[in-house]
Structures are given as C-alpha cells and as structure tokens.
Amino acid sequence: MKKSVILVLFFVALTAFCGENKGEKILPKPDMKSGKPLMECFALRRSSRSFSSKPLPLQIISEVLFAADGVTRADGRKTVPTARNMQNQKVYVFMADGVYLYDGKRHALVPFLKGDLRKHCGTQAFHSKAPLVLVFVSDMSAIGNTPELQSLYAGNHSGSASQNVYLYAASKGLATVVCGLLDRSKLKTLLKLKDNEQVIFSQPVGYPRK
C-alpha cells in the first residue's frame, strides 16, 4: 500500500516538473470580488495608446485573460458569448519573454514562441512598450457557411472579448485599446495558423504612462 502511494506521488511530482520545464504558467485564480462596480466601469471605459513598460503582476494577467476568454461553468462555457456556443476563438498572449496560448479550461499560459515579438502585433510603436498584447484569432471554418456570416460572427466574438478586457481595464486603472492596423499575413505565418484561422485584431494592455 505504501509503495503504491509513493509511486502515485512520484508520478504527480514528475508531471508537475515536466510542466515547469516546458515553461507553462498556471495562472492564479481571478479575484471575483475585486475592482470597481460595473456601472462605474462603463463610465470609465477608454481607449488609450499611452503605455508604461512596467510589467503587470501575474494576478492582473490572470484576470485580463479570464475576462477575455475564461471558463465560468462546469460545461466549459466562457465569459464571452459565441454563436451556438462555437467557442472558435483563440487568444495569443505576447509578452517580453515570448508568445503564449491561453488555455481557458486550465487557466494557464502554454508556451508557443520564445523571444519578444510584440512589435508584430501592430504598426504603432506602443505595441512594443505595452507589457501585454492579446491577439485574437478565429477559426472561420467553425462559424457560418458564407464569408459574410463568418466575418460577422468572428467580429462579434472578438468584440465581446475585447469589451470585457476594456471593462476590466477600467476597473483596475489600466490602459488598453483595440488595434486593427496590423500585418495579418505576417502574424498568420508567425503563429503558424491554419488556412481556416484568421487574425482579427490585437489589444495591448498595461499601466498608463504618466
């Protein structure tokens, strides 16, 4: 019996060790009671293009991503509504140390690319300064059977996610803005996206520059 328990504990520890070696970051749980009242956040919501390079704490990053694409229910439904619950959206996270893919089910950052690649998230220089840049990607094959419907649904899904991030930023005194001026073809290649996957827009997040 003791040998069985020791063996189980060994494999648990080994799994955790391997996860750390891969650079995966398990995010802290969001604080559901923090921040300003919702109605106040509506009034404070702003688009800001002026960012401090000060790093964001992991707790803030956790809550930004939860707002953007977090799982809220046991059946896997999220903070963001999608048509027929398609859940066709991915959120790539660009930071100074690399690019990660957000895993909402596990609330974790999965390493994707090494190095500071924030400059590829938009044509404006502030993308390289903001400590966190989200890039929203949509699987177009999962939404609708015409280009018009695909564009409509993809924009709606990413728009809902970005508004969640806007309201969270307002709640925490952060700066953010949605950016459509970006080289989508270059990002598609960089992120090794499939033919049916499309970059929608980016959204830098950080402390406002004083």
Kindly label every feature range from the protein language model.
Residues S128-P131, N196-Q198:
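Short coil/turn connectors at secondary-structure junctions
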Residues G19-A130:
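N-terminal amphipathic, basic helical "cap/leader" segment at the start of enzyme domains
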Residues K192-K210:
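A glycine-rich helix N-cap at a beta->alpha junction
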Residues R45, V64, V91, L132-I143, ...:
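Small-aliphatic-rich amphipathic alpha-helix that forms the alpha element of a beta-alpha
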Residues D69, A96-G98, K105, V137-S141, ...:
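Solvent-exposed coil/turn segments that connect beta secondary-structure elements
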